[in-house]
Amino acid sequence: MTLTNPFIQSALERIDSPEVIGVGIVGSYARGQEMKYSDVDFDIFVSRLPEDPYDRYTLRYWDDKLISLKYTLFDDERAALTNPRRAIWAVPGLRQMKTVLDKDGSMAALQKAAHEFDWSLLQPAADEFAAEEVMGNAEEVHKILSGLAREHESTVLYATWWLVKNMLEAVAVQRGLMIISENRYFDLIQDSVGRDSAWTRAFRTAWGLDPNSSQYQARGAAALTVYCLTASMFDKLIPEKHRKVVDKTLQLIKDAEI
């Protein structure tokens, strides 16, 4: 981390208050991977959030650096370690964090908990989340099918965005992928599923990463393929209460012959 002590101390003087429990630097500066345009991310752990919601996350320019200030309830961050959807982000973030203020040892204890984190305890909840996402996104499939049938570009693109975004998260959470950086999110998921897999090829087309996927029809069709392959990936996790919705949705995709 190349930030100078005077800079850090100056920042802490502006940040500190009676509600602050501790402060950590996260992101590229914590990992030693900062570049020319990197901002400095301060996670500020507090006992009470600022009253104005806009003050809970804000940006500033200090000493010619873009500063990100994110206020988080300390107890809420600890609770994130028990939620699979949040843990894939919280655990690596806490492990990498460089603590610059720890008033009572709470920050050290939180980082220790992150280093001792056991994903296996959350796997059942992660499986349930993935199954719920497959079921819940049947609505987006219907929207894509409707948009394609009506040749309505905006409908297809909006539903494609939501469907693919949610299938990505389902895979990341179910597989317990530790997101070491938001810049690696798409890389980590594609690497996990397989760069040459049908799922990844469909994702890249749906997301517009394929040079031949500029047309909304191709992207919508690829998003439907992502859904089918994700449903197949998690087939054994889908409970009976969701089976009819998922199976009917898969049949609609098949019948559409897109």
PLM region descriptions:
Residues 3-4, 58-152:
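Conserved NTP/Mg2+-binding pocket subregion across the NTase superfamily
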Residues 4-5, 14-17, 49-52, 63, ...:
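Serine/threonine-rich low-complexity intrinsically disordered regions
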